[in-house]
Swiss-Prot record:
Domain of life: Bacteria
Subunit structure: Interacts with MinD and FtsZ.
InterPro entries membership: CAP/MinC_C, MinC, MinC_C_sf, MinC_N_1, Septum_form_inhib_MinC_C
NCBIfam families linked: minC
Disulfide bonds: none
Coiled coil feature spans: none
Pfam families, per database record: MinC_C (PF03775), MinC_N_1 (PF22642)
Protein name from the UniProt record: Probable septum site-determining protein MinC
Length: 228
């Protein structure tokens, strides 16, 4: 009995076009050869005019930019096919380090005084105060276990879903991504409580009760609960 040949390329039609599942164990040259053969055998012409989007999934195979371009070129040379995305389940060490820096929580215990700037790439957990004239900046969220009376800029690299939270919120200025908010009205003595700031659906920064974060940003870690 003839042994069935391992399929390195699987083609599935979807409502958005076609999806190519490429084996991650065979050699890249074998993969290209079978991909070319299968795309030549299957004729995708749609209505003869519109382009058909192709989504490529390569599993646990890392592709260099050159290899990605080889796949794009091969598919592009077939009638009416255009690559919409190439997805891999693996990343380079450099990409992993960058991702870790952008998503990790950086705990720092200090007082940020006037004229000082504290800047982290990921999420900032500051145990201490930000005095008037002091600035804290984070690529992600900012949590201040203390008084925020200076300037805070969360989502520094463009993350509009970032939030700012503080035990005492009396800032000079709040910024989230590219949206800024001037100092809110000073609270009366004894009225201070833990609060959070976020960008609402109207693209304005809103300051509200910290407890609302659970509903506003359900994907946040449980860290903010420890600030209450």
């Amino acid at each position: 009995m003839e042994e069935k040949k391992q399929q390195n390329v699987t083609i599935k039609g979807t409502k958005d076009g076609i999806t190519l599942h490429l084996d991650d164990c065979c050699s890249f040259s074998e993969l290209l050869m079978e991909l070319d053969e299968k795309l030549s055998t299957h004729y995708y012409d749609g209505d003869g005019r519109s382009l058909i989007e192709v989504h490529v999934k390569v599993g646990n195979r890392y592709l260099t930019e050159v290899q990605q371009e080889e796949i794009r070129t091969l598919i592009r040379n077939k009638k009416n096919l255009v690559v919409d995305s190439i997805e891999s389940d693996v990343i380079t060490k450099a990409e992993a380090i960058a991702w870790k820096e952008e998503t990790e929580i950086v705990p720092i215990s200090k007082i940020v005084r006037s004229g000082q700037v504290l800047h982290v790439k990921g999420n900032l957990l500051l145990i201490g105060d930000v005095n008037p004239g002091g600035t804290v900046i984070a690529g992600g969220n900012i949590f201040v276990v203390g008084s925020l009376r200076g300037i805070a800029h969360a989502g520094y690299y463009g993350d509009s879903d970032a939030v700012i939270a503080a035990s005492v919120m009396n800032p000079m200025q709040l910024r989230i991504s590219d949206v800024a908010m001037r100092a809110p009205e000073e609270k009366e003595d004894g009225a201070e409580a833990a609060e959070c700031a976020y960008i609402n659906e109207n693209n304005h920064i809103v300051v509200d009760r910290l407890q609302l974060l659970t509903h506003l940003r359900p994907n946040l870690t449980k860290l903010e609960r420890g600030i209450v």
